[in-house]
């Protein structure tokens, strides 16, 4: 099939690579406009654009998917199918109806669960045991179209949003190609989504990383994993930003009675390779962190150069 591929971030770039290595032809790539990045605010290409340019494929970067000039360009290209993976913009009906085989989307959750943005992070934040990828026909409303096929993955106990992203990126491309092959031969199913089971998730923002230590330790540990690598869980230590990269929940049998003398957010014990933080329910043991102006390091490395005392209150 002659395909137009629409996508923007790293997970979409991995899917694009799979399609480029298949029997199908990518005739053009559509991605979001270049954006300033880093401290120097230099313009950076979206990951999908980098892959497309390396493969010698034309790249389109419209400000809006409904721009008339862009829609006309798609009509001239006349693709058999439009493939969408984390493009970041809703497509108008005129585009959805354009290709012979329609527009199909690669979504990083087991629909109808987690429609919308950030499904990968929310699977970890909510402590899900499994996640997966859904290939679906696109509709005018977000993530509501009929399902073609899905593939599940099991979340590890120490799964981060970053590691789950990589798992789903690995299976997303091959699953999309299987769906394309099934569509081409007329064997692709159309499974309606159960609206009663549908859930929606919102986009993440940096403020979500500010940990509230009155929450249970189990929830905070998930939060640290679910916001890794972005936007990252954090707190304050003596007025400086302290990013929290890895933690463990201290087993109940290890807890002493000293915690009764402290408030949530207090450091209640300091060891050679870790320190313990009291929460609203349970204790969190820090294993990897990053103080403002420093690199990411293990807590053991951090404690070699920083004197930390029990009773210190985080968040101030």
Place the predicted regions along the sequence by residue.
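Donor/substrate-binding cores of folate-linked one-carbon enzymes
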Residues: 21-22, 32, 81-200
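N-terminal Rossmann-like dinucleotide-binding module
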Residues: 1-39
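Internal anion-binding site segments
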Residues: 195-316
């Amino acid at each position: 099939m002659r395909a137009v591929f629409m996508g923007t971030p790293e997970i979409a770039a991995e899917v694009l690579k799979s399609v480029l290595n298949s029997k199908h032809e990518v005739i053009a790539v559509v991605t979001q406009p270049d954006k300033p990045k880093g401290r120097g605010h230099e313009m950076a290409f979206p990951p999908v654009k980098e892959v497309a340019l390396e493969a010698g494929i034309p790249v389109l970067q419209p400000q809006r998917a409904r721009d008339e000039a862009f829609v006309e360009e798609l009509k001239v290209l006349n693709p058999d199918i439009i493939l969408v993976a984390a493009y970041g913009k809703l497509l108008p009906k005129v585009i959805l109806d354009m290709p012979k085989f329609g527009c199909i989307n690669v979504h990083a959750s087991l629909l109808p669960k987690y429609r919308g943005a950030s499904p990968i992070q929310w699977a970890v934040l909510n402590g899900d045991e499994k996640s997966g990828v859904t290939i679906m026909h696109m509709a005018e409303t977000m993530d509501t179209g009929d399902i073609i096929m899905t593939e599940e993955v099991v979340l590890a106990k120490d799964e981060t949003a970053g590691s789950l992203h990589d798992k789903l990126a690995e299976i997303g491309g091959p699953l999309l190609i299987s769906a394309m092959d099934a569509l081409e031969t007329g064997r692709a199913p159309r499974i309606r989504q159960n609206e009663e089971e549908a859930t929606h998730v919102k986009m993440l923002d940096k403020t979500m990383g500010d940990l509230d230590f009155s929450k249970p330790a189990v929830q905070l540990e998930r939060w640290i994993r679910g916001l890794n690598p972005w936007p990252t869980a954090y707190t304050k230590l003596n007025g400086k930003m302290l990013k929290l990269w890895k933690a463990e929940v201290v087993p109940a049998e290890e807890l002493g009675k000293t915690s009764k003398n402290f408030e949530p957010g207090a450091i209640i014990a300091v060891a050679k390779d870790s320190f313990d933080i009291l929460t609203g329910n349970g204790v969190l043991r820090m294993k990897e962190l990053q103080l403002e102006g420093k690199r990411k390091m293990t807590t053991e490395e951090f404690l070699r150069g920083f004197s930390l005392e029990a009773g210190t209150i985080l968040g101030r």
